[in-house]
Amino acid sequence: MQIEIKIDEKCKEPKIIVMTDKMTDEVNAIIKRLSDEQPQVIAGFRDDVVEVLEPSEIYRVFAESGKVFAETNHGEYAIRLRLYEAEQRLDSKTFVRISNSDIINLKKVKSFDLSFVGTICITLSNGTVTYVSRRSVAKIKQLLGM
């Protein structure tokens, strides 16, 4: 993919033109990302205090007991989004759903343990251990290039 920037003093508003011979998943992803105006931050609630959580600080987003939580360096925060809404809001190249109840930040993964039959054990850099569901194993192996 080539990127070209032209500076024009007459231009009052940035304009993006995508030139391609056919529509591909890559082109659709670029268009979606450019047109997405949703905020990329998530509000986390803990002890009657609301904090803005940057996606780069989030290790994982998970559902437990009917509630959704985001785990960061500073602990766990309740978030008022459904898991699929959090998945849509977070960058799909960085955050991957590994089960019906867990989305992980690939940049925060310390190791993948493939010795388990039918699943993958993931250790995050903060020490949290989580498991890939059988349904998601193929997707994770593809991400790892296996």
Question: What is each residue range found by the language model?
Answer:
Residues 26, 139-140:
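Phosphate- and divalent-cation-binding pockets in alpha/beta enzyme and binding domains
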Residues 20-22, 126, 134:
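Short, structured patches in soluble enzyme cores that scaffold and shape functional sites
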Residues 9, 22, 48, 83, ...:
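A broadly conserved detector of short glycine/acidic/proline-rich loop/turn motifs that flank catalytic sites
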Residues 141-146:
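Short hydrophobic/aromatic patches at helix-to-coil boundaries
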